[in-house]
Amino acid sequence: EFRRVLFRSAKYNVVGVVTVADKPSGRGLKVNESAVKKFAVENNIPVLQPVKLKDPEFLKQLADFKADLFVVVAFRMLPEEVWAMPKLGTFNLHAALLPQYRGAAPINWAVINGEKMSGVTTFMIDKDIDTGGIMLRQECRISETDTAGDLHDKLMPIGADLVVQTVEGIIEKNIETRVQRSFIQGSEVLKSAPKLTRELCHIDWNDSTRSIYNLIRGLSPYPAAFTELVPAAGGAPVQLKIYAGAKVEGDEFRSMLVRCGVGDGISSGPSHGDQNGVDDNLAVNAKEGHTGSNIKPGQILSDGKSFFAITTADGAISLTDLQLAGKKRMEVKPFLAGFRNPSEWKTTLGTSKVEIDKTRK
C-alpha cells in the first residue's frame, strides 16, 4: 500500500529502496524477498539490502543515489550516518499518535491497553527514538473487537496517504514541524510501546476479564497470546495459542458455571499455584465479580463440545480461535473434537499482568 501510493506521484522520483536482506523461511528454507523489494524490482528501482547500516560500502551506495529526502516505514533504527545524509532530512511514519506509544510495537500496545483511538504520525528522525518534530497526524478509531492485525490493516491506507502528503509538503515547503511536547494535554500520561516479549504473551489468568481479552486482541495474529496446559495427573506442559476469545461476565458467567456443574459451596482458598507453577483447579479462590460462586482464576470450563473457557479474576474468556502446539489453528468446535476431557487439564501461572504493569509505572 505504501509503495504504490508513494511511487505513483509525478512530483518526484523514487531513486532507490532500502529493505531487509532476503531470508530463508518455511520447511524448505526457501529464500523469500520482501514485498517492497519485489515491487521495486518490477518497477526497475535499485534495491539495497544491507546487513549492517554502518557498512562503508552500503553508505557509499546510499550516497550515490543523491536523494533529497529519505522516507522510513516499518524499518529498524537508523544511525546518524544514514538519517543525516539527505539535504531535506529523513522522516518516519509511526503507527500511533505521537507522542503517545513511542517504541517498537505501537499497534499492539494500543489494543492491549484498550484504546478507542489510534492513528499514524509522520515525524523527522533525530538522535533519539520517536522524539523528532511532528509534521502530520491522522486519527483512526479502534473497535471493541479489533485485533492488532485489524488495526494494522486500517492504518495502512491512512499511513500511505499521510506519507505522500508529508513528502509533498516537504518538497513544496508548506509543512511545519511541531515539538512533540506541544501535543501533550495537561496532566496527560505518556504510554510506551516496548518490544513484545514471551513473558507478555503468557497469559496471567489472575488478571481481569477485560484486560485478558484486550491482551489476546493486541497479540493477534502475531505473536499470539498463549497459556500452558498440564495434565492434572502430571506431565509436561503443552502450549495453547489463543487468537480470539469472548468475554464471559455476570449472568452469562454464572450460567456457564451451572452448565459445567460448578455451583456454590466449593471450598475457597488462596490463589496460589503448586511448587511447579501450576494452578490447582480444585482449589478455588473467592474473587470479587465471581458472584454466586467461589472460583479460582485459570480453571478450565467446557462442555467438551461447543465451548472451552478459562476463568479470570472476575469472569472467564471463552476461546474461539486457538492452536495447540504441533497442531493446526482452528475454531473451538473442531478443536474440542480432537481434545478429549478438557476438564482433566490445568493451566500454568502466566506473567502477562506483571509485564503490562511495568509499562504503567
Label for each model-derived stretch:
Residues 3-28:
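N-terminal Rossmann-like dinucleotide-binding module
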Residues 20-68:
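N-terminal glycine-/serine-/threonine-rich beta1-alpha1-beta2 phosphate-ribose binding loop
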Residues 10, 43, 85-86:
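Short, structured coil segments at secondary-structure junctions
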Residues 3, 20, 67-199:
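Donor/substrate-binding cores of folate-linked one-carbon enzymes
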Residues 186-270, 274-361:
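Internal anion-binding site segments
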